[in-house]
Amino acid sequence: MGRENRLSAVAVLPQGLEAAGCDELSKLGAHEVRPLRRAAEFQASMACLYRLHLQARLPFRLLREMASFPCQGRDDLYDGIRRALNWERWLHPSMSFRVDVTGSAPGLNHSHYSALQVKNALVDQQRDIWGQRSSIDLEAPDLSLHLHLNRETAVLSLDGSGGSLHRRGYRAAMGVAPLKENLAAGLIQLSGWDGSVPLVDPCCGSGILLIEAALMALQQAPGLGRNFGLEGWADFQSELWQEECERAQQRRRRNLNLPPLLGIEQDPLVAEQARVNIAAAGLEEVIEIRDGSFTEHHLPEGPGVLVCNPPYGQRIGEEEELDHLYSALGGFVREQASGWQLWLLSGNPKLTGGLRMKASRRIPVSNGGIDCRWLHYAIR
């Protein structure tokens, strides 16, 4: 890929998964990948950018940088947006659009106000050209714009995602405290599970960790079958896009004999939610869900990997109820899982202490705004 053909872009990532996100971007063909806070910047060809939309598991969004300009206030922003692109080509009045803004600049400290200035610049220019303007659509716009303000610089990007990439489409049923799919995929990547040994979730909830693990092992691209905003770009290359779609489809391992993937869930209603999600993902023959407490079941022949996102006790009075769960989990692991690895997402160090085990690794991540640690235990 010649440097002149490279596009500048940013992947928006879950907090704590920046390094894992950079690794994934590089493996899929991105260049000059550099971690940022909750993001990574990179260079890519158009083919690579299409590939990332289809195959990357960790990003929330992928933003293609289109223009940058000095911005020291409202007037600079208004004028800069009007000059940023050939809007006659990119935004016809028949198209809807939305604007998202992050960061701040002099006199532009509120994202809603800054977005309003971008909107005004665009619709004023449309009226000058066509005598009519586009409508705003916050749910399913034809063109999604992203503006980042960094002190005295504005960067305008196109959001090719068409909705957050963490929404895979299989999640028909939500758990009480749902784990986002891209965070789940990142946690599985950090665990090092590669599909060669059993994987068990003793508190599986709606099954997201197991589903994302199975999809990774089968190399099933998360973006296949969904619509993307980039398909409405003025320079969209349909043949190149189809090539990348076919490439993603061909990667899927259809006859792979995976070791056992097992989820255990005490609440029968939640266990049924997991089965619904697994069926929606087409993984009924890959993942087994068992009802009841993990103390009532035996692990498959190992060694293998245990992954777990138990409750954190966020509500008043819950901690006392959960003390027994963590204590029982620690006993279960020590009794049954000799030689296994345990990875547990902890949002409450006090409760995790009830395991009576010492973690060998503590990786900071954020789950739904809760400061968490992805803890690793080597069971002896």
PLM features: residue spans?
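SAM-dependent Rossmann-like transferase core, predominantly class I methyltransferases
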Residues: L156-G192
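Non-catalytic nucleic-acid substrate-recognition regions in nucleic-acid-modifying enzymes
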Residues: G2-P141
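C-terminal catalytic and target-recognition region of SAM-dependent MTase-like enzymes
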Residues: G292-R380
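C-terminal edge-of-domain segments
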Residues: L145-L158, L375
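Conserved beta-strand/loop positions that form the S-adenosyl-L-methionine
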Residues: L147, P202, S206, P310
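Short beta-strand/turn micro-motifs composed of small residues
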Residues: L13, E265, S346
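Conserved S-adenosyl-L-methionine
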Residues: L179-H298, R315, E319-E321
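A short, flexible beta-alpha/helix-coil linker loop
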Residues: S104-G107, S164, P311-R315
